[in-house]
Curated annotation (Swiss-Prot):
ATP binds at residues 91, 93-94, 114, 126-127, 177, 184, 263. Its EC number is 2.7.7.-, 2.7.7.108. This is Protein nucleotidyltransferase YdiU. Disulfide bonds: none annotated. The keyword Repeat does not apply. It comes from Bacillus cereus (strain AH820). Nucleotidyltransferase involved in the post-translational modification of proteins. It can catalyze the addition of adenosine monophosphate (AMP) or uridine monophosphate (UMP) to a protein, resulting in modifications known as AMPylation and UMPylation. Keywords: ATP-binding, Magnesium, Manganese, Metal-binding, Nucleotide-binding, Nucleotidyltransferase, Transferase. It holds the Pfam family SelO. GO terms for molecular function: AMPylase activity; ATP binding; magnesium ion binding.
């Protein structure tokens, strides 16, 4: 069933120009009684949709997979991935790309239904999703967007009227995810593992045309592609680290070629500053701990470089050298982006020899005194040094004098320095206990008002508004560490 186009659907299907080994065409599995519980109005408008039309029954049927919009071409994408270091052939096991929405400004975005039923890549899974994890992805991805961190976004969440079974019986839901594309490091691993250089080349050419058209004429465009992805990921991971975001499952199938954050399963934001912070219940070894994220990104990008070796140079030794040389640049690019970001968080404009040690000393003290990461920078920004173990310590008081002296040294006024800090230190993040509170109200009680209020606060993280203050309070100390789950 297809419907007419009053809502603003304008779908294209460039992904189907790739060899058919990269996808399987399959319709979504219908559900019994879909209900729209969340629609992203501003995103809908930017994509060229009419939000009021999207609330109608016929459109809700599309978000549920019970109907298809005009021009839809549903398919599940194939890819591979190193999951916690182990290589597997994977694919969309519970998601379908229904098409690429062409926006009024000529941009192209994937529209994907997540939780739309089983596919040939489901590996014994039911292809469904639970309401809690889908709402969680909506909240965190919108918070990331507001924090100016490249991310996939959520257009809608519908409940299915059917239960899904995980450890317990849970209400089912489908999320409509929007992404610049769903091409991953794992997509290239999939192509390389199949052994067809022609297919690998087709994927690389398609990716360049879609994401990096400026390098199409490059003498060695595949090396240039690797360089661009490294640059994007170095910037992305630096942004994660600067706000205390912990992804939790940085497998190669969750590293996008576009440089967007994807898959909000076991992610969370750090409260107390600790390099070893892990939230994911399945990350028992701390592989994807906060402090490891830059190293794991480099590891994942090395897998991309390996996959590209057959097309980097006709001589394998030369291709290997190119790959190694490019990967070695990641840490330099990441450090540069992170250092620049940390300087902004401390209001430092110019470059001084002492800047590195100022930053390192502060972080060391924060870890020692288990200081709240976000609130420490928030207090420095507001210049309200509260009564905490960190701020009361002699070493902090010494550091504070050095920092103030450093601010006075630069040409820019302190007023400008504090303004820059305000623009780079969010006063509010999606605190784990607040997110859980919103999910509990929505999933258990059918009360979405807690989530709406939280989303409103998170939509302007640099506002420093008084009405946001209740969301700045860290969780109460507890003996039980916060744990996240992947939702699959």
């Amino acid at each position: 069933m297809t419907k007419n186009n009053e809502a603003g659907w304008n779908l294209d299907h460039s992904y189907t120009t790739l060899p058919q080994s990269f996808y399987t065409e399959i319709p979504p599995t219908p559900v019994s009684s879909p209900e729209l519980v969340k629609l992203n109005h501003s995103l809908a408008i930017s994509l060229g949709f009419n939000p009021e039309e999207l609330k109608k029954e016929a459109e809700i049927a599309i978000f549920a997979g019970n109907a298809l919009p005009e021009g839809a071409h549903p398919l599940a994408q194939a890819y591979a991935g190193h999951q916690f270091g182990h290589f597997n052939m994977l694919g969309d096991g519970r998601a379908l790309l229904i098409g690429e929405q062409m926006t009024p400004s000529g941009k192209r975005f994937d529209i994907q239904l997540k939780g739309s039923g089983p596919t040939p890549y489901s590996r014994r899974g039911d292809g469904r999703a639970a309401l809690g994890p889908m709402l969680r992805e909506y909240i965190i991805s919108e918070a990331m967007y507001a924090l100016d961190i490249p991310t996939t976004r959520s257009l809608a969440v519908v409940t299915t009227g059917e239960p899904t079974y995980r450890e317990t019986k849970l209400p089912g839901a489908i999320l409509t995810r929007v992404a610049s594309s769903h091409i991953r490091v794992g997509t290239f691993q999939y192509a390389a593992a199949r052994g067809s250089i022609e297919d690998l080349q087709s994927l690389a050419d398609y990716t360049i045309k879609r994401h990096y058209p400026e390098i199409e004429a490059h003498e060695n465009r595949y090396t240039a592609l690797l360089q661009e992805v490294i640059k994007k990921q170095a910037s992305l991971i630096a942004k994660w680290q600067l706000v205390g975001f912990i992804h939790g499952v940085m497998n190669t199938d969750n590293i996008t070629i576009s440089g967007e954050t994807i898959d909000y399963g076991p992610c969370a934001f750090m409260d107390n500053y600790d390099q070893g912070t892990v939230f994911s219940s399945i990350d028992t070894q701390g592989r994807y701990a906060y402090g490891n994220q830059p190293y794991m990104a480099a590891w994942d990008l090395a897998r991309l470089a390996e996959s590209l070796i057959p097309i980097l140079h006709e001589d394998e030794e030369e291709a290997l050298k190119i790959a190694q040389d490019e990967i070695s640049k990641f840490s330099v690019q990441y450090e540069k982006q992170w250092f620049l970001g940390m300087k902004k968080k401390l209001g430092l404009f110019s470059n001084e020899e002492q800047d590195q040690s100022l930053i390192e000393q502060l972080l060391k003290m924060m870890e020692k005194f288990k200081a709240d990461y976000t609130n420490t920078f928030r207090s420095l920004t507001l210049n309200t040094i509260e009564n905490t173990a960190l701020f009361e310590s002699p070493e902090f008081k010494e550091w504070y004098k050095l920092w103030q002296s450093r601010l006075e040294k630069q040409e820019e006024s302190k007023e400008n320095a504090y303004e820059m800090m305000k623009n780079n230190n969010p006063s509010i993040i999606p605190r784990n206990h607040r997110v859980e509170e919103a999910l509990e109200a929505a999933v258990t009680n059918g009360d979405y008002s807690v989530m709406e209020k939280l989303l409103e606060a998170l939509s302007n993280p640099y506002a420093y508004a008084t009405e946001q203050e209740e969301y700045c309070v860290p969780p109460a100390p507890t003996n039980r560490p916060y744990r996240t789950f992947c939702g699959t």
